[in-house]
Curated annotation (Swiss-Prot):
Domain Rieske: 44-142
Secretion signal span: none
Cofactor note: Binds 1 [2Fe-2S] cluster. Binds 1 Fe cation.
PROSITE patterns: RIESKE, RING_HYDROXYL_ALPHA
GO BP: any one term: 3-phenylpropionate catabolic process
Organism the protein comes from: Escherichia coli (strain K12)
EC number: 1.14.12.19
Gene that encodes it: hcaE
Annotated metabolic or biological route of this protein: Aromatic compound metabolism; 3-phenylpropanoate degradation
SUPFAM superfamilies in alphabetical order: Bet v1-like, ISP domain
Name of the protein: 3-phenylpropionate/cinnamic acid dioxygenase subunit alpha
Root EC class: oxidoreductase
Membership in a protein family: Belongs to the bacterial ring-hydroxylating dioxygenase alpha subunit family.
Domain of life: Bacteria
């Protein structure tokens, strides 16, 4: 069995000097360790509460490569279970979502209540004349399930920090999406799913730390849609063009701490997002006063930004896209994209949000394709021996980190930096190399102290 010491994890990641060896994106042994020590120990997004509002409502998803079913209980609480029959490991729930009174295995007919208990075994007296202790054979339950302002997370590790502690300062940035209006948020429409032939860490890192790519990777989209407010017809919608926000922003920052990352621009416009249509930008202008009262000016104006909660939950402010990067091997990721909107928005505005998110960041989105092409091409190149063992530069903004005194929390840097990427890979390496969460937290504290010297 391959151990963390065999893999020399800390020789592959050097965050103090800004180095990463790309073998971390290709090695199958590293990937198997990730499934155990990252996806088996971290808080992972499962669903939004709006997707399972009534008792018996369920939603099927994954924790790493483990299929799980999330279900609303009769008392209103939420449980999650491994989507696997305890008899011969068959899946017990197939529909993406729905409402049910029981989950029945199609192989031999074992049936489970929505609370996970085994409630029926066909031909039980004849098949098990010696008796069967059904209370012992219920579905395997995810032991830790918690919600944060509508987002449901699960964790297999009972020794992990609670969800709120795990989120840390990224919660302040997350609230900028979840808490703009009274009533919170909801998921609009279904889930868009597609597969990208790249390692899961590429998209996670980009959403945590990489605004830098947008100037070049998305240059053609900006040019086609209209690079400035010049009165031309190259518009996304009434009153909104694709003028790059970095051309007019007052300032910008990147946050990177505990493996999480975020970046955004300081703007003076309540509709400052380059990829939304007229109905959406009008909605942001009309609701700005409420958002400012709830969040303050900085977060109310924060509509152009990128974010990732370690390991695989990403979102873009303003564009209304929330997505999960489900790992499917060292060289493949399955994207699940949701449209998340204010619950208080009108149906017309929600439809506009959905159209806008799909147009830019759906599977055929004009920006999504730029990103996917980059990640896939990198993954192809890393098939080469020298390519996957040649160190890459992760030095952007190295040594320039600071803590702000204006109420914006956490370790920050200028937006064009790799502070969040270095923090993400440090948390990644610490998890793979540690036997316990306490050891991880001790290493995190030491790393952050070193960063802020």
């Amino acid at each position: 069995m391959t151990t963390p010491s065999d893999l020399n994890i800390y020789q592959l990641i050097d965050t103090q000097n800004g180095r990463v060896t790309p073998r971390i994106y290709t090695d199958p042994d590293i990937y198997q360790l990730e499934l155990e020590r990252i996806f088996g120990r971290c808080w992972l997004f499962l669903a939004h509460e709006s997707q399972i509002p009534k008792p018996g409502d369920f939603f099927n998803t994954y924790m790493g490569e483990d299929a799980v079913v999330v279900v609303r209980q009769k008392d209103g609480s939420i449980k999650a279970f491994l989507n696997q029959c305890r008899h011969r490991a068959m899946r017990v729930s197939y529909a993406d979502c729905g409402n049910t009174r029981a989950f029945t295995c199609p192989y031999h007919g074992w049936s489970y209540g929505i609370n996970g208990e085994l409630i029926d075994v066909p031909l039980e007296p004849r098949a098990y004349p010696q008796g069967l202790c059904k209370s012992h054979w219920g579905l395997n339950e995810v032991p830790c399930v918690e919600s944060y302002k509508g987002l449901i997370f699960g964790n297999w590790d009972t020794s992990a920090p609670g969800l709120r502690d795990y989120l840390g300062d990224i919660a302040w940035y997350l609230d900028g999406m979840l808490d703009r209006r009274e009533g919170g948020t909801e998921i609009v429409g279904g889930v868009q799913k597609w597969v990208i032939n790249c390692n899961w860490k590429f998209p996670a890192e980009q959403f945590a730390s990489d605004q830098y790519h947008a100037l070049f990777s998305h240059a053609s989209a900006v040019q086609v849609l209209g690079a400035k407010d010049d009165g031309s017809d190259k518009r996304l919608g009434d009153g909104q063009t694709a003028r790059p926000v970095w051309e007019t922003a007052k300032d910008a920052l990147q946050f990177g701490q505990d493996g999480h990352g975020s970046g955004f621009f300081f703007t003076e416009k309540p509709d400052a997002n380059v990829w939304v249509d007229g109905a959406v930008s009008s909605y942001y202008r009309e609701t700005y006063a409420e958002a400012e009262q709830r969040l303050g000016e900085v977060r109310a104006l924060r509509l152009a930004g990128h974010n990732n909660i370690f390991p695989t939950l990403s979102w873009l402010n303003g564009t209304a896209t929330l997505r999960v990067w489900h790992p499917r091997g060292p060289d493949q990721v399955e994207v699940w994209a949701f449209c998340i909107t204010d619950k208080a928005a009108s149906d017309e505005v929600k439809a506009a949000f959905e159209n806008s998110a799909t147009r830019a960041f759906g599977p055929a989105g004009f920006l999504e394709q730029d990103d996917s092409e980059n990640w896939c091409e990198i993954q192809k190149l890393l098939k080469g021996h020298r390519a996957r063992n040649s160190k890459l530069c992760l030095e952007m903004g190295l040594g320039q980190e600071k803590r702000r005194d204006d109420g914006i929390p956490g370790i920050t840097n200028y937006i064009f930096s790799e502070t969040a990427a270095r923090g993400m890979y440090q948390r990644w390496a610490d998890l793979l190399s540690s036997e316990s969460w306490q050891e991880v937290l001790d290493k995190t504290a030491a790393y952050q102290q070193e960063v802020m010297k």
